[in-house]
């Protein structure tokens, strides 16, 4: 996180978003989705990629903190791609409301809001590091994060996101 926070506008944005996510949020009513129900959303067949780690997950309930996570890792030569689906009952999503439409590009990185299907997303790519992230808000409840290293652009992240059945994931928010 130090590497990211030390850089200009993106660092300021991340610091503000980190602050917001630490503040008590209004949880979405409903049951926490168990990680076993989230694993199919990260278990993908990606053309040109092989699975590096078998999909895994965790569900945790402790007092006022509830969270489920499913994740999987892929590789293609020196390139890596990690996919995570998180259910925090909506407590991690206030930052998406702050970014209805944003675009920033510098000599070091690109940051912009986009749509992945019907869902709001924040896309970031660091040119020198060849590191990209795609963070998607699904039904104002689930946080889908795709992160890649060794990438020439964010196209592999977008292609992987397009293979995820995000509309089906949204139905679990009920």
What residue spans do the PLM features occupy?
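Short, solvent-exposed recognition patches
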Residues: 28-131
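Bacterial N-terminal signal peptides that target proteins for export
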Residues: 1-13
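Bacterial N-terminal signal peptides
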Residues: 11-21
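Short acidic, gly/pro-rich beta-turn/loop elements at beta-sheet edges
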Residues: 82-84, 93-95, 146, 156, ...
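Short, well-structured beta-strand
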Residues: 130-156
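Short loop/turn segments at secondary-structure transitions that flank enzyme active sites
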Residues: 89, 142, 170
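Surface-exposed amphipathic alpha-helical segments
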Residues: 148-174
């Amino acid at each position: 996180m130090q590497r990211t926070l030390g850089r200009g506008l993106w660092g300021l944005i991340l610091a503000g978003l980190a602050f917001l996510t630490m503040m008590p949020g209004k949880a979405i009513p409903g049951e926490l989705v168990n990680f076993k129900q989230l694993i199919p959303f990260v278990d993908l067949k990606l053309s040109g990629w092989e699975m590096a780690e078998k999909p895994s997950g965790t569900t945790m309930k402790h007092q006022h903190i509830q969270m489920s996570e499913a994740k999987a890792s892929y590789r293609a030569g020196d390139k890596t791609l990690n996919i995570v689906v998180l259910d925090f009952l909506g407590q991690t999503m206030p930052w998406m409301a702050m970014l209805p439409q944003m675009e920033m590009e510098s000599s070091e990185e690109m940051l912009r809001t986009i749509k992945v299907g019907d869902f709001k997303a924040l896309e970031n790519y660091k040119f020198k590091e060849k590191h990209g992230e795609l963070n998607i808000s699904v039904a104002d409840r689930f946080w889908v994060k795709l992160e890649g290293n060794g990438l020439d652009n964010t196209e592999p992240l977008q292609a992987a996101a397009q293979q995820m059945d995000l509309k089906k994931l949204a139905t679990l928010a009920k």
